[in-house]
A protein has these predicted regions:
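Alpha-helical substrate-binding/gating segment
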Residues: 161-167, 177-198, 206
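Conserved Rossmann-fold NAD(P)-dependent oxidoreductase catalytic core, especially the SDR/UDP-sugar
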Residues: 90-129
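N-terminal Rossmann NAD(P)H-binding glycine-rich loop of SDR-like oxidoreductase domains
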Residues: 4-24
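Catalytic helix-loop patch of NAD(P)-dependent Rossmann-fold dehydrogenases
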Residues: 82, 117-156
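NAD(P)H-binding glycine-rich loop region in Rossmannoid oxidoreductase-like domains
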Residues: 37, 47-83
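Glycine-rich NAD(P)-binding loop of the Rossmann-fold in SDR/ketoreductase-type enzymes
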Residues: 50, 79-90, 98, 128, ...
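Conserved active-site helix of classical SDR/Rossmann-fold NAD(P)-dependent CH-OH oxidoreductases
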Residues: 19, 88-89, 139-146, 150, ...
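Conserved C-terminal active-site "lid" loop/helix of NAD(P)H-dependent oxidoreductases
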Residues: 199-201, 208-224, 236-265
Length: 267
């Protein structure tokens, strides 16, 4: 019997991952401040990722933490610091206090969002070039994860996820889509990899129009992507037109998060 804690379990990625990480003999301890109902093989906990006592209690007896909680996009510096950075500190520290040996952190391509197309494919351990406060928070927590590995021996895997949605929504996502099933494969690989140590890997499907980022580290963890956004290409291009290489959204990895402040989508 194993126990995996999932923070932010009521969110989009958490909701897609939960059924895909369910296994006989595995309990998913799903935690969120938003209402959620425990499914088969789950224990639901209503708590904030910023609550150290609640998080430490949730981590007791667990084998791994999948840390998804946080604001999933740009917001004020104060909110980003409180939830994305502060909440991530709580997640790692609670795991340490409870003796959890492994944390898998949902980082983002926005940690390196200002990487230009001329530098594609982006290496797994590319130096941070965050495109927003949100991207800064992801880069900061990658550094935090490295510290928890080097100081405490914790396995800490940071997944720079690109575009994880039920299906691609626009032309950019024909290159950056991470399908729900491939997300499940990626996180499962991270849960079962033998003594991974500290890793930074990108999360994306095997898209025909991909090649934007390295998949070497993800594959080294055992990830084998099977899905391809090209299955949706005709539908997307009919709605949005062919990709324009001069489109500012396509000039850097971070897409619309690299646009001027008043055009960046906010939460």
């Amino acid at each position: 019997m194993s126990i995996v804690v999932i923070t932010g379990a009521a969110g989009l990625v958490g909701s897609m991952l939960r059924p895909r990480l369910a296994r006989p003999g595995r309990t998913l301890r799903v935690l969120d401040i938003a209402p959620l109902t425990a499914g088969p093989g789950e224990e639901a906990i209503a708590a904030s990722v910023t609550d150290m006592d609640a998080m430490t209690a949730a981590c007791r007896g667990a084998d791994a933490v999948v840390h998804l909680a946080g604001i999933p996009g740009e917001a004020s510096w104060e909110r980003i610091c409180d939830l994305n950075i502060g909440g991530s500190y709580v997640a790692f520290e609670a795991a340490r206090r409870a003796g959890v040996p492994r944390v898998i952190f949902a980082s983002s391509n926005h940690a390196v969002g200002f990487t230009p197309r001329s530098d594609f494919p982006v290496p797994d351990y590319a130096f941070p070039k965050p495109d927003t406060y949100y991207g800064v928070s992801k880069a900061a927590v990658e550094a935090l994860a490295a510290m928890y590995h080097n100081r405490y021996g914790m396995d800490a895997i940071c997944l720079r996820i690109l575009s994880c949605f039920p299906k691609p929504l626009n032309v950019r996502m024909l290159s950056t889509w991470l399908s729900p099933d491939d997300a499940g494969r990626l996180f499962e690989a991270c849960l079962t990899a033998e003594r991974p140590g500290f890793r930074v890997a990108f999360g994306v499907s095997a898209n025909t129009r991909g090649g934007w980022v390295s998949l070497a580290e993800a594959r080294a963890l055992g990830y084998q992507p099977q899905d391809d956004a090209e299955a949706y290409a005709a539908e997307i291009i009919a709605e949005h037109g062919e990709p324009d290489p001069d489109d500012p959204v396509l000039r850097c990895l971070g897409g619309e998060f690299t646009l001027p402040d008043d055009q960046v989508p906010r939460r």
